[in-house]
Amino acid sequence: MTKSSIMRQRAEEFSSLIEEKAMDEEHLVRIVLNFDDLTPTDEKTGIPSDLQKHIPGHLLFPYEDAGMATGAYLAATSLHFRLEESPDALRRAKKAFHAICHIYELGKKGCCEGFFPKPYGGKFSTHTSRDQYLFAMSGLFEYYQIASKPEQEKIRHMLAKMAEHWRTINYSLSYFSLKKQCQLCDYIAPMFLGIACLPSRLEHSPECTKETERLIFSEKLGEKAVDTLTARFRRGETYDGACYFRQNENPLMMKSLAMEHLWNAMPAHRDLCRVTLENLASDELFLELSTQDGLNYYIMRYNPDADSLELTPPGRIPELTNPLNLSFMTWGGDRRRAGSTQSVFAAIIAASYLNDPELARKAEHILWQLTPDKFRGIFCSSPEHIPPGYEYMERVLYCNYICYWLWDYYLGKSRKLW
């Protein structure tokens, strides 16, 4: 078999796995399964209840990023159908669309229209996050291209209400024990540019355009977009109390996705998008990559003397802030996982708009490296590199990263990058 046919077969196997094993009865994508038998997690999996004690860990964690995973799967299957008109892809996309609508209705009934909750245990919760919104909204946008007229009308309404919700709450929220605070001040705040402008990709929306302009200039999200962690550290600044890259592939994916929407919704800001993507590609893309296996290191320290990243010994890193007191957030060592799927997404966006074929080739190579066995929850050289209480990571399959792999693969194909 050729490399191309192997990748295509892998994509079909991944798509089938998500549909048949990871989706629950409402077609929400659980972000983890038991690795050995691909069954839903249970008490025996050993996931700690470290965020909300009254919800068992095996019900809470699989749904922590279910909105993101389902949105990514919706985008991937929609792109797949547009490319090949596959009946299987259309069926899967419709299931994922149902799931996103289900979460939307949970928020509407439990709080207000436009609130998109984290559906712990498949049910309503008072918690959400901006990345859930951006992924779900992006999935809806891709599905819109293949949706029926009634579905398209529903999607336009949902996107408008979801963007409006953030304006209504002044981009502020609380999360478990964390106090309510504005989300516009940190490094990943530029993702809101994607949320704010996305409805205007489907219909004329002076309100969304005006709000996006306000965020760019008055809230200085334009300045934040072109900045990078590397640049901050070179200026002698810190982030989260120190100079570490900690799961930085997530901000990279969010920022590049926001630039994707801004580029197309508001062409006047393409220079901002271009500089943002150039800085992302030159300063941060693939810094955390383990080239031997295509996985990303979870946490790495910036060394100002060498102007490079380095691993730290296993153990708690006291200088890093950890307001939720989660050991995995500040535990050093050489643990790795398939977060590189998010780095690849950012590379695809950058390669598309910067016309960089070498970046596209590197992205494709990483996808090639990520064989099915690479989606285990954690890889490390010895047990002491596993954060205390998180031994279960060796026993789970990360389905969200499989969904991101699929989105990467079909997005790259749709842009003729491979």
Give a label for each model feature.
Residues 62, 68-82, 122, 135-139:
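Non-membrane alpha-helical segments in proteins
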Residues 1-24, 146-150, 256-418:
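Terminal, non-catalytic domain-edge segments
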Residues 128-195:
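Aromatic- and glycine-enriched pocket-lining scaffold segments that form the walls
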Residues 80-87, 143-156, 202-207:
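Inter-helical turn/loop segments and adjacent helix faces that build the functional surface
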Residues 4-19, 74, 90-104, 137, ...:
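Hydrophobic core segments within long, regular secondary-structure runs in both alpha-
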